[in-house]
Amino acid sequence: MPIKIPDDLPARPILEQEGVVVMRRTDAVRQDIRPLRIGLLNLMPNKISTETQLARLLGATPLQVELTLVRMTDHVARHTPADHMAAFYRPWAEVRDERFDGFVITGAPVEHLPFEEVGYWPELCRVLDWTQTHVHSSFTICWAAQAALHHFHGVPKHLLPAKAFGLFRHRNLAPASPYLRGFSDDPHIPVSRWAEIRQADIPAGSGLETLLDSAETGPCLLDDPAHRSLHMFNHVEYDTRSLADEYFRDGQGPLPAGYFPGDDPARPPENRWRGHAHLLFGNWINEIYRTTPFDIAAIGGGRPPANDAGPIEAAAG
């Protein structure tokens, strides 16, 4: 099944050119299927690029996904046209009484600030608490993952002396995890951040499990079953040229490690993480499908395995 997004969202023609099946609203109405409702709280400055990256991954599974774009209620986006925000994004205050099968919260370029000094921190805390009563499963990315670890578990973030920047080899620490089904032993994942969380700070007894880590950049992906969340500190969703664009945008500082062939920025980078990005989001969507209530109104009242038909292949068979 395809992803259902607004007919005139800029991501649509890009995804269609890539072969992602994008459903028009009129077609979706004719299918007697309850789509998985996925919300995307987009905190990134370039919202159009980010929504395209994530829609690409969410739309690549056999299940029909209905994507709702969400923004912070009072925060005004400065890098995305106001007409785009008005046309495609709903403030969180408007959706807070609704329920979602999945909810993605992106990173934001505010790592240098203490959490409490971020202008929308109080509302983000309310959003995180709301996911525990109105969302079946959450997926936080980069700064949002650091924020969730701090909010739910008191885990601090640590500023780095230099930006962790590049394409780094990671270790698969939990090959039996349903979220890492199909993963290789050493996936490469893009990293771009000025702060980190440390394995030593993860509280004993928290139930947090580190699924992926890197010897160079630390924890990458944590499973948080107590809060029905995955926390991804890096950027598996990035486009092939995302790190290159950051490098040239920032005045050509240190090269992104392990990214340009031969460390030559004149040579086009190769995408060595796309397959794992699709696997991770596909596995997450599959776990949502297997465990979310068929009646979306029941989300928040438990986690009954209403659709426990096994992996997507069995469900779609």
Swiss-Prot record:
Cytoplasm as a keyword of this entry, yes or no, is yes
Q: Where is the active site?
A: C142, H235, E237
Q: Name one GO cellular component term.
A: cytoplasm
User: How is this protein named in the record?
Assistant: Homoserine O-acetyltransferase
Enzyme Commission number(s): 2.3.1.31
Supply the PANTHER family for this chain: HOMOSERINE O-SUCCINYLTRANSFERASE
A Pfam family recorded for this sequence: HTS
- The organism encoding this protein is Rhizorhabdus wittichii (strain DSM 6014 / CCUG 31198 / JCM 15750 / NBRC 105917 / EY 4224 / RW1)
Give the matching HAMAP family. Answer: MetA_acyltransf (MF_00295)
